[in-house]
Structure formats: C-alpha cells, structure tokens
UniProtKB/Swiss-Prot annotation:
Catalytic activity: (S)-malate + a quinone = a quinol + oxaloacetate
Keywords: FAD, Flavoprotein, Oxidoreductase, Tricarboxylic acid cycle
Name of the protein in its database record: Probable malate:quinone oxidoreductase
Natural source organism: Cronobacter sakazakii (strain ATCC BAA-894) (Enterobacter sakazakii)
Pathway per the UniProt entry: Carbohydrate metabolism; tricarboxylic acid cycle; oxaloacetate from (S)-malate (quinone route): step 1/1
Keyword Oxidoreductase: yes
HAMAP family xref list: MQO
Enzyme Commission (EC) number: 1.1.5.4
Gene Ontology molecular functions: 2-hydroxyglutarate dehydrogenase activity; L-malate dehydrogenase (quinone) activity
Keyword Flavoprotein applies: yes
Amino acid sequence: MSKITLSRKHAPAFSLIALLVSSAAYAENTTEKTDVLLIGGGIMSASLGTVLQEIQPDWKQLMVEKLDGVALESSNGWNNAGTGHSANMELNYTPEREDGSIDVTKALEINEAFMISRQFWSSQVKRGVLNDPHSFINSTPHMSFVWGDKNVEYLTKRYQALQQTTLFQGMQFSTDQQQIKKWAPLIIEGRDPKQKVAATWTPVGTDVNYGEITRQLVGSLKKTSNFKLETSSEVTDFKRNADNSWHVTITDVKSGKEHAVDAKYVFIGAGGGALKLLQKTGIPEADNYAGFPVGGSFLVSENPEIARQHGEKVYGQASVGAPPMSVPHLDARFLDGKRVVLFGPFATFSTKFLKNGSFFDLLSTTTTSNFMPMTDVGLDNFDLVKYLIGQVMLSDEDRFEALKEYYPTARKEDWKLIQAGQRVQIIKKDPEKGGVLKLGTEIVTDQQKTLAALLGASPGASTAAPISINVIKQLFPEQFKSEAWQSKLREIVPSYGQKLNGNVALTQQVWDETAATLQLTKPPVIQMKDAKPATPEAKPAQASSPQHDMAL
C-alpha cells in the first residue's frame, strides 16, 4: 500500500521529468538539417550555391552571413578594384625569365579562368538569374602603361609573347605618346613629350561589380524553396557527427541567441574570416596555414569630367625594389549607377582580417602550429616587410605624387582617400623553408570530403565560377563524373573541359556569345591559325617569388 502511495505522490514529478526528457530528445531530433551550409554571403558562396542549385536542385542550402546583408565585405564594389582579371594588363602575371624571355603560363591560366566566369554569368543572364548586364559588367579597355628604357623593353617583349597565343589577340601596342593619348588622354596630358613610354591596349577588358552579381545571385536563390539565408548570424562552433556530417552552432550577433544545424557538407567562403573558422573545425589540415592581413586604400575621383575622359583600366609596373603586389593602376569604375575613377592601391596595415572584423583577428588565428611559419615568411621576405612599412608611412602628399606619375595634371581637390577591403594572404607550412607565402587562392578540404574552405585573395572574385566548380569536384568526386552533372555543367559553362588557348574557333565563339549576352563591346576577329598552347620550356620566371600573386 505504501509503495502505491509513494508512486502516486511522485507521479507528477516523474511525468515532468519524462516530458523534459522527451522534449529534449525531440529537440535533438528536430535540429535544423541542410545538405549544404554556405558560410559567408559573398561572391564565392553565392556562385557555389548557384551552381549547386542548378546541378542538384533538390538539395537544401543554408547561407549564413555575419553582417546585415550579403556582399557588404570584400565583394562590395567599393572594397575592391572591380577588375575582370584576365591578365591583359597585369604585368605580375607575365614575369621575365632569367634568359630574358617572358613566361605567359600564369597569364593564360588567369585568362582561361575568367572566360569560365564570363560564360557562367552569361548563362545566368539567359536563365533570368542575373538581370541588366550593365548593372554588373561593362566593357572597359585594359591597358598596360610603362616608362623608362628597361620597362619599355619588357612591355615590348611581353606584347610579342602574348601575340603568339590565341587568348590575347586583338591587343595593340604603341610607344607613340600621341597614339597612347587617343587610348587614355589623362595619362599623357602634361607629360614630358621626350619621356620614353609604351602601352598595350585591348578592347576585351571589363569592369565588374562583384557586389551586384552577389546580390542578384542570392536574390534568385532566395526564390527557391530549398534555399535559406540567415543574416546577422555567425558560426561559432563545429562538431563532427558520427556520419561525418557537421553539427554547427550559429549565433545571432544581435541577440546572442544560439541555434544549431546539421549539415552534410560545409563550405567556408568567408573571405578574411575563413582561416579562423577553418581552425574552429578542428580538422588537422587547418594546422598547415596562417594568415597575414594587408589592407588597401584608393584615391577616388567622382568628378564627372575626369570620369568622362578616362574610360580605361591602366596598370603600371611596380617600382624598383617594390614587390609586384604594389602595381599601381588608374581604374575607370561604374559604381552605384555612376562613373568614377580610382587610383591605387596603397597598402595599409591592420590586425583585422575583415574590414568589419576584430583587431584581435591576427592574434586569435596565431597558434603554436603556425607561429614559426609566419616568422620564417617575415625573415625571407624583407623587401615585402620594407614595402609595407613604407606604405604605412605615406603622407597625403606622397600618395598624390604617386597619382601624378600616372595622371600628370591631376588636382588635389578632385580626389579623396577611401579605405577598401582587407586581404588575408596565405602562409603555408613548408618542409624546407618552414613557411612560405602561398600564391593565389587555395581550397582546403578534410579527408572525409565533407568540408571545404577557401583561403587566399588573388585573383579573387574574377575566378569565383571556376573555383566553385573546383570545390564541387573536390567534395563530390563521384557525382562530378556523372553524365547528369557533367551535362548540367556544360549548360552553365559551354566550353567546360576544353582549353580555349590554341583553339581559335572556340575562343572566338566564347568571346562573341558572352559579349552578346552580357552586352559588351563586340570582340575583335582573331586573325591567326590554331596556335600551339604556350609551353613553359624554360624555368618559370621568379617562381620562387611569393609576392607575385599577393592581392590588395
């Protein structure tokens, strides 16, 4: 009898405990689930999400962005130079070999990658995902401009080397100041007529607003039932589940409220924030990397008369003793519906990894595993350290004098200094040197192929489409080979799997079709037979120089 009384007495308590246990179990079982978690609301995640939505539309995708909206960090038009990087004018992609010849290998690689991006954007216009091409891409001639005997000789050889390739046809070269003035009057007016100069000019260059592309891609994804965007939300923790999927904690940056999501696959495309997130995952591959932040500032003119006279992007040569990352350029831009002109970049230093980041970013990503590689890089690249110190010490007058080298008649009152985005350069462990600056961008994946992170800064947004396809290839090797996915990829990028260089007909077709769809200037007709792809028969020039691909 007493046992029955005890049981009745405690029944409500037992019921409450049972309810709490079952509720907890239910909550655990109802954790939000997604096939793909995209961390970061920039051009990289937007591009990857778009490709995945096309090849596997039934997959659920969740995009998480720390700021109040997408494309507010590095993808924002004011936080980058807006160049469609295709190596038409960027001299650091065509270094001089020891024997004096020009190595165009990297230039071809960059150009091929950008043509994939052009086809990707073109296919999105045809699908109605991207609208009004002029809102995000505009024809802008690309020019290289140098002065002095040595630089003129170099540019002459560079032009001759590029003329042996298919992808750089239509380029023109001149050492005549009057001809160059017709291409870009502002860089010649007021210049000593006796100064020895040289320039190349090509009509196939572009100015790209990567922020606008990002906003439109995400806007289209939001219209699909399987895509969800969470802004003002930060990923704060990762735990690997038994099935190798990821249990990810997401925190509302305003309220502090947490919720979790189970994701089969994770992509960390958070720009400067990617390294810290990669370290949080705990995967051993993260131990191989460190990051060093370099910011950039630009002089900008919104004077309509200056913008009217300068409709090109003009890239110069780095000064003697300065690393190639310091190449100055005078850029025609189309931002927020108006034409402006930018000059720079001038390197700045901050311990932040993001423009909207924390001053503790550098310290918080420095670990016992990557401290020595960072030290080794500093010791091995003293010219870079000296350059950065010199840049930080520049006065307003110094910056204006640098502008006048490219625009001799510039007036101070027409220009103001703006701070652009942060670029985190990769430092990777090296068995011989301890640590090296890693060129370009790098995709880091775990052994289980359920997580990928994108590190690095150059050439950046220009290659968002090929990088997205490469991420898919690495995470989903079997599906990638399937005819279903290959067929979809060829719809997105018709030339996928084929090299353009050396194939005149295909190059012309891609040029013409993308130009028509994107409403760009009609490309020149390629006047050459099928060419042999350039071969690096000699040792690549300055392959050991780690600063060639560093980005501001």
